[in-house]
């Protein structure tokens, strides 16, 4: 399970675009804590610390203890905004966590023991991943870091469903029959790549022929005008 992480914050009295810009100029990020049957609380968190947490991965599945003005609040990130050009965080939304509450989160899927899968190791098959994350409804303090899928003994043609996986905590929000991955023969993906490359080459050839035809028509037009 993910450990609870601490995050220092300061309370914000002013809100709005102007106030948010002022916060960012001070090296902080405007944020809000909402939910739990309480009014939203506007805060500011350190830019460098928050950016590091976001880009380290697993940010939205981490439970935080936020210390704002001496008052500690447990919350989980629900959303964040990044500058489309620089990638710098612009705003973070935190959901306040209360006793007995569950949240829905996307937990990453990690595949292990690929070398112990005969279909991959011996026969050259390829692991085709269908779901990189699984949606779980789980208590905030029980969110797993990842869901492991053991590939030991897997052969070509095997399909791994959610029902084949041990969910460490919480409940999967989809169907037990949902596929997570399958092992395909080496020729399958190769054929798909070849078909895609052939389609691209055909499209490029057609485009080149069209451009050449347009150039020829333009040359004929010029010759006619000169005559």
UniProtKB/Swiss-Prot annotation:
Q: Name one GO biological process term.
A: translation
Q: Where is the composition biased (Basic and acidic residues)?
A: 209-227
Region ranges (Disordered): 199-227
- Is-annotated flag, keyword Nucleus? no
What keyword terms does UniProt attach to this protein? Ribonucleoprotein, Ribosomal protein, RNA-binding, rRNA-binding
Which InterPro entries does the entry mention?
Rbsml_bL25/Gln-tRNA_synth_N (IPR020056), Ribosomal_bL25/Gln-tRNA_synth (IPR011035), Ribosomal_bL25_b-dom (IPR020057), Ribosomal_bL25_C (IPR037121), Ribosomal_bL25_long (IPR001021), Ribosomal_L25_dom (IPR029751), Ribosomal_uL5_bac-type (IPR020930)
- What GO MF terms are annotated? 5S rRNA binding; structural constituent of ribosome
GO CC aspect terms? cytosolic large ribosomal subunit
SUPFAM superfamilies linked to this entry: Ribosomal protein L25-like (SSF50715)
Coiled-coil features, chain-numbered ranges: none
User: Has the keyword Ribonucleoprotein been applied to this entry?
Assistant: yes
Supply the NCBIfam families for this chain.
bL25_bact_ctc, PRK05618.1-2
Q: How does it assemble?
A: Part of the 50S ribosomal subunit; part of the 5S rRNA/L5/L18/L25 subcomplex. Contacts the 5S rRNA. Binds to the 5S rRNA independently of L5 and L18.
Function noted in UniProt: This is one of the proteins that binds to the 5S RNA in the ribosome where it forms part of the central protuberance.
Protein family = Belongs to the bacterial ribosomal protein bL25 family. CTC subfamily.
Provide the protein name: Large ribosomal subunit protein bL25
- What's the source species for this entry? Methylobacterium radiotolerans (strain ATCC 27329 / DSM 1819 / JCM 2831 / NBRC 15690 / NCIMB 10815 / 0-1)
């Amino acid at each position: 399970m993910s450990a609870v992480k601490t995050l220092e914050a300061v309370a914000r009295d002013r809100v709005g675009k102007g106030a948010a810009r002022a916060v960012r100029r001070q090296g902080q990020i405007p944020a809000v804590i909402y939910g739990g049957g309480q009014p939203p609380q506007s805060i500011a968190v350190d830019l460098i610390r928050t950016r590091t947490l976001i880009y380290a991965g697993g940010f939205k599945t981490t439970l935080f203890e936020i210390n704002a003005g001496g008052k500690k609040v447990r919350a989980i990130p629900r959303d964040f905004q990044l500058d489309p050009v620089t990638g710098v965080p612009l705003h973070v939304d935190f959901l306040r966590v209360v006793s007995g509450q569950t949240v829905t989160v996307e937990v990453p899927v990690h595949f292990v023991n690929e070398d112990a899968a005969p279909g991959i190791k011996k026969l050259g098959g390829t692991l085709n991943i269908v779901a990189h994350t699984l949606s779980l409804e789980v208590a905030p303090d029980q969110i797993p870091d990842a869901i492991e899928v053991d590939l030991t003994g897997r052969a070509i043609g095997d399909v791994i469903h959610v029902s084949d996986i041990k969910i460490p905590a919480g409940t999967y929000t989809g169907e037990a029959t949902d596929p997570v991955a399958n092992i395909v023969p080496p020729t399958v993906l190769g054929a798909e790549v070849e078909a895609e490359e052939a389609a691209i080459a055909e499209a490029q050839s057609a485009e080149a022929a069209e451009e050449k035809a347009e150039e020829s028509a333009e040359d004929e037009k010029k010759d006619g005008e000169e005559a």
